[in-house]
């Protein structure tokens, strides 16, 4: 259990900020030696230590860490609040309020719309699914009873983490609720899922943290909705408002760069109306730094909590400096840390890629900042096991040998990007023409649409995926999940510029099968609040540059030389080659790439080498919750593989794996597509957070690894058995065999 020192609580006041408080001056504070911000060089040392190397992380370094607070705002919990933007639980069920001027929304209007849209994307907000009773802003947790409308008063702080040149500008946000308990302090680190912005985890982990009186430390992991419209040369600020790229300079959330062969001006002339997205075109390979980003967000949270206004104890300041003569310069306030890693409970938690970031943060954390981890559906890439045989996964009468499931996320997504459009062709979500094009290329068998669809599905399941994912994958195809992620990951891993047009793709606004066109000012203003950092969203489409006689076309409307509407199979095969290094669709098949194609492949593979997870959780308690029907982070390649790596290499493992039947990656899609055969995975993420909090605070036992047999067609009270209920089926690991019961 964490040893929590008694401290005192003082009221929150509104400090200096941009677009929220009075004068807009950024203030720099430095924390010295006392240690809420431990030296990152040491904190990020990825040694193979099983546990924390320091007995007291608060005094382990004499280094200083600086954060420039770009914006602060206090919310009263009535007219506006931290969690629901003043709308309350019921208000989040409707559409986001429209801005008074849609072309120039204020930072406040953008924030409100962003929070509403995050709830729409992340939660199934149907009362029949449990919204408002089992989960949601006003729903009780094991340790908290929120207000009737779920509103939370408190203060919000923004800052960038950057190398000093504005190239990274990882957005961090800390929310401190007014009922933050300094006698029992806790921090929840909540990295954004997917490619979403810094508010991405507010509707899941942020909600749990604020309801339980914890400060919440968010990070966009160096991705987020950074949109550079090359047509207008406008970019986002940290708060989502837009300005001219050259005017904003290092304060831009993201500004695209050209290449030695082509600058942005020449590119815009050749490919008009194009868009650069930070998630794809930052040229930073942000995933390589996800763990570091989470640790930086935790450091920022400690920094904020130790500000004098948050009841931190200020040490001796310069008596000759007054507020008046400090007004026009950056001010350094030295703080004595009262809240440190040794007396504050820290849980890192999120879902999807945010879950992967949390796991990798703990792998890096040799200073003991993090006490426990809870993640759902992590998009994790486990490193290879030393043994060629690895671990065997058994589920019922199915056996998955190591060589069948040791695949990266990029490998699986690029494979699905080829075949899923055909596998879905018997639904309204697929493409008949993709099946015909695949048959012509000799990549599937069958002379009828029915047999071709069946063969495409057979190939996908042979790749190591579960048949229970097949139906939900149709919805992912309809949402362009595979094509969007395949393109974004390829660009990010290879550090490609927007001007490189990797595999003949770009991003732009378009209408139907028309050529790219200028995005309206209202569409650009909407990107931050309704986009998810990926095409196709908020009017930004994935463009096949060869369509419409090389003027470009929405990739989905691409027509091949035979007149088939087939969704640009050529581009999909090009992206697949970046995973295989050959002309084949399977690894170790086809002809090896040469020349420029080989060089592109090597760039992508070099980036992937930087993102593997070690599986070393330093003996810290960790819970992974995963939906069995996840058709993105397929269980065999992600959660099961990571659990196997950890269990087979770490004798002091406290990792718990909970697999939930009839649950998938995107709760929001359950509502969007009116899916009633899937249950909300978020409900079990909440339960796992309660169990972890109870374990760390009170020493209760962690749950056993298990399968939870949900029953989507039962009544709300009966469809969702609790963790460790008598209905659960235990997962076992012995002699390098992971046994998953059908349950």
Regions found by a protein language model. Name each.
Residues 31-32, 40, 50-743:
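C-terminal His-loop and adjacent cap/lid subdomain of alpha/beta-hydrolase
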Residues 9-14:
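Hydrophobic helical h-region of N-terminal Sec-dependent signal peptides
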Residues 5, 23-26, 180:
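Exposed regions on extracellular, virion, or secretory-pathway luminal proteins
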Residues 1-8:
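Bacterial N-terminal signal peptides that target proteins for export
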